[in-house]
Each structure stands twice: as C-alpha cells, then as structure tokens.
Amino acid sequence: MFAHRLCSALLVLAVSTAARAQSTTEDFKWLTGTQAVTGYEGALSMKLMDALKAMHPQRDSIGNVTVQFGSGAPHRLIATSIDEPGYVVSHIEPDGYLRVQRLPQTGLPPHYNEMQNAQPMLVGTREGKELPAVVAGLSIHLTPGRANVPDPDDIDNMYIDMGAKTEADVLRSGVDVLSPLAAARSLLRVGPHRWAGTAVGDRFGSAILLQLARALAAKPGTGTTTIAFVTQQYATSRGLTRVLEVEHPDEVVFVGRGRKEIARQARSGEEAAALPALGSGAIALGTPATWFGSAMTSSPAAPFLQRGYGPAIALPTRTLHAGVPLLYPLTAGEMLDDRDLDALLVSLEKYVGTATTPSQNAPAIAATPYPSPAAKPASTPDIAETLRTLTESYGVSEVEAMPREAVARLLPPWVHPETDAAGNLIVRFGNGSKPSAVFMAHTDELGFRVKSINADGSLALDNKGGGSPAFFWGHPALLHTSAGMLGAVVALPDGFDTAKFHFPADFRVAATLNVGAGSADEVAALGIKVGDFVTIPKRMNTLVDGRVSVRSLDDRVGCTAMVQAVWALGKDFHRDVTFVWSTREELGLLGAAAFAEAAAKAGATPKTVFAIDTFVSSDTPLESHRFADGKLGEGFVVRAIDGSNIVPWADVQRVEAIAKKHTIPVQHGVTGGGNDGATFVRYGATDVALSWPLRYAHSPAELIDMRDVRALADIVTALSREW
C-alpha cells in the first residue's frame, strides 16, 4: 500500500535486529524506533545488550547496560540515557478511555501535554506488545460558543482512545493500569543532513556510544573506559546514580540533551540562551572542560545529574556534559544534524585514544518517488482496503489529482467517469441529463501550500482548511514536489517552550516549514518550488473492535461509501442518479458550488442532493453533550442540522424509514460545519446530508467505526434505488 511503501522509504522505523546496525545513522533508526518511556526501558535495554553482545555487556536490575574496555588509570565513565518522556495508564474508564500519569511528572516544557493532543500513540500491553491508540483532541467544529473549553495542557483533560467501548475491551487487549504510552514511532530525513522525530534528543547519545564501543572493541585506547546506557534519567537520574555508585570513575562524560536552567530563569526572569545552530558541531552543555582535549562551543544548561532521595552524588572534578544542538526539543519534530553527531563521535574517540571512525552518513537526500498506481479491481474491492487506499493518498485542497485518480481506479469497468473544469469526478447513471438525485463527497484534505521561499531557507505556507495549530506545528511533514516527497517539519516559533507562548486558536495563522535548508539556493537545490503542497504523514491504524484511525477520514469515508455503492448498483442500474467526488470543500465548498452552478445553467438541478460528509461527533469526554453524540458503531447519521443547512424533518424521517426497511442502523443529529449540498439549495434542490460519526475531526487522530462506514455504503445504495 501507499503508506507502507512510503514508511519503508522515508519514515524510518525500527529495524528488526539491532546488532546488524553498523553506522551511526543505522543505529539511530532502530534506537528512535523503540519505545522506552522512563521506567519502561526494558525492550530498548535488551536490544542494546544484543547490539553489544560480542563485548560482554552487563545489565542490572533496572535496565542499565554497561560495557568496559581497557585497564588502568584513568577510569573514564562515558554515559548516556536511553529513556524518553511519556505516560503510564493510571485508570481505565467504564467507556474504555484510558487516563494517564505523565513520566516524568515535572520538568517538561509547559505545552508538552497539549502537543500530544490528537496524535497517534503506542500503548504497551502486559505481554510487551504495542497497540495503536490516539490522544483525544477538541474539534474546531464544536468549540465555538462554549463557555468553558477544556484546557488542552491539563493532564486531567487527557484521554487515550484505543477504540475500546468498555473497560473489559481494554483488558482483553492486554492493556492495563501501568501500561506505558508514548508517541507513535517515526524518524524523518530532512534535507541532506538532518533527522527529525520523536525521541531524537533522547537517542543520539546511544547512537554515538554504540559506535564508540565498536571502536574501543577494536582498539581499547588508554586507561579504562566504561560505557553506560542508563535508565530513568528523567526520574531524578536513578540509573546514572546507580552506575556512579558502582563505578567510582575518575572522569565522567555524560552524552545527551541539555535541560533548561529553569531555576536561573525564575530568579532572573530571563530566557535560557539559545543553543548553537544545527551543523555547528558538538557542544559542551554547562561548564566547559579544557581537559577533554577537543574544543566545543559552550552553552548554558542545568546539571545533567538530578538529585533524588538521599545524599547527593559527588561528581569528579573532571566532569563534562557533551551534546549536539537540537531544534524544537521534546517535540515530535525535534531535529538534529548528523554532521554534529560525527563531530561528537570524533571528539569522544580522540578523548579515549582510539581510532576515528570515518563518517558513514549519507551526504544528500533525494525525494521519495510517488508509488505506481494500483491495478484496477476486477470485482468489488474490500471496503476497508478501499478506505486505506483513499486515506493513504495525499491531496490537499486544489491539488487533488492523487485521490481523484485513486477513486477512478477503484470504480468498476462499466462506468465512464468524467472530470469537469473544477476537477470534480463525475459518474452518471441513466440518461444523465437531469438526475433525480446527486450523491456528493469531497476528495480534498487539510494541509498547506508553499507561499514563498525565505532567504534563510524556510518556507512560508498558506493554510488549506481549518484545524488547531497545536495539532500540526512542531510535527513532521511531507513536502510534495514534482519529483516526489521530501521530509520536513512544520516550524515552531521562538519561545514555544515557555509559559508565555500559546498556540493560536485560528488555523489561518501563517505557518512556516523547515526543510533542512539554510538558504533559498539550498531550497532550490532540493527541487522545491512555490505552489508545492505540504501534508502531515499518515497511516491507517486498526484499533480495538473494528475501529480505525488516520488523518483524512474526512471525507475519504464518504468517497469510499460512494465507490462501494457504485459497485453494488451494478452495470444494469439505469435510474437517473449522479455521483460526484467534489474538490476544494475545505476552502468553502468550491467544487460543489461550481457543479451546482453548471447544473442550474443546464436546467439539470437535481431534486435532492445527498452530501456525504463527516458528522463531527461529540462522542468523546472533551466535547459538549448538548449535541446528539452520533455514537460510534451505532450506524450512519442523517446530518439534520449543521452550520450550512437544515434538512426538512420529513426527509429525515423518510431516510430513516428506508434504512429501517433494509435493517441499516441509523442515527440523526445536530453538528457544526458545512456540507457540499448547501450550494445547491439556492437553485431549488433539497440538501439531505448523510454522515458517519467521526471523533477528533480535522486532526491526525480522526477515528471511526468500520460498521458505520458499511452502514453508510448500504444507505447510499438503498437511496440510489428507492429515493
């Protein structure tokens, strides 16, 4: 499938056998691809043991991994932490939602929780497996007018949705209280030298020290060197404290991210000094060390050894905190430069007296080609696979060729689709002159387009569609060029990690894209042009009990239902019914408006338009229940009232009667937003909007129940025959 091929080529996930990794880059891939929430580092710890097995590593009861080389003085300890921030399940609600406690509870940026809202996650089971889940997020459609909108930063408003309907469903899946939870794994190449993704700042030290261990295994260097991969660094440095108590080294080098000097900021009211730029080399965090032997740029940071219970550990006089510059730290789009990793590795090898490892990092990155189209199906395609194909196609408003072509390929061979001047894909049954009914779903999705290229290599973006900036800023992105796809990150402004910052409520606030370039010329060298479009990566995940989650279910579910209905109607269906897959809905129903106007001018306005689009469900703990919920798993929804239309009550009842006749589960309700059918009303048509319940609309965590999709396809088929 499209996303699977993309993920193998561009979104780099964990490799199956850590021991095979031989370069810093290859180590980095599986290290970042392994979840290791503080206190739950077991899987990563064991992979490190496997990677080091030829060197006789030791592993203690809390997962610290150590390996020693050489003999005599001085005794150097070079340590790095392997844990990452995350959450642990603290309670399971009767309706299947998970409540969580954060690990660590303090010390993270003020908006850390908010940036997890409406994002894909991985939750661990008792058996050590990982299951997909999402964090609940507020929908922009239901927020206007609310007096007390839940604070997205407050962990009391954090709910995890794994698709379960009951506590028993959760427990049957293997998830329980104490299950760890962390962001879904992805590592993205950005430009020729940068990597971006979750836990980048928590794993680069391990990638460096694995290389150092291999060099020492070949040539031990001078004195004694102990390399340690320590756990629970976010929990008052418990792993490092234990190793220090055991080793009593003469010198200590800690390799890892820096912490902001929070106490100093509180005293002075100042912001912490910015780190050196990416690509400028290794850095010394905190107090510089002339004894280390390599010059490093110094940057202030809080001490890496955090005091817990008991007396403080006395560090040797010769102690250094070494690292690399990080951009957007502690976010899903956290970024570093592999040239800095090389510089740090060379410095460490010089320090211990072993051979320098030549860089094996790739000097350039090419765009990932778009996959070849799938073959046309010879029989009715599976509804879930149809949905996967359509959701994993990318098509921002105004650039919808990919999903339109995907729909066309999925249609049966006996139909003859046409495309109008607005880009709408049309299938006509009957004589086609004046259809009695039009069914319409839109092909576009939220995203951005490149508005301009700045002198510093950043890209100014135009927003296409509406959604919360907190769901997109600071997250990995894909830039779609004429040659293929490039990795990028939707940039965060300076000061995003301070309490003064707040995400804007309006998605139309301009966003910026980081493509790993330092100038406009470097952008041009990557093949990027004004007008290229940008999306957030996506992959359809199957959750518990028949539910799925992926961005762009709005409105690829509607598109899927119509594809299924066309197949079900068959080649001998001759009623005057038209199916339209419309464009630019997210920009104001523009494709639908063009079709409606053209139909009116031709005297072909239909009597009824069935606009098929999302019912933004309040079936979540975060939304106001003054709306009829539109519960997942209980059938399609007659979208009786929204921001653009009121369906005549008699038509609501008529749809429900046809549904009941065919035992199709049906609901009706009130929601927000607009629908394509509203553009036909001025010309005399009745807009009868059909929907399915969707949680977390306009976010990366959109979530549905496949039973509702089947019900939607069934009612479209039935209405085509009987309305």
What is each stretch, according to the model?
Residues 18-723:
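N-terminal hydrophobic/helix-forming segments and targeting peptides
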Residues 5-16:
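Bacterial N-terminal signal peptides
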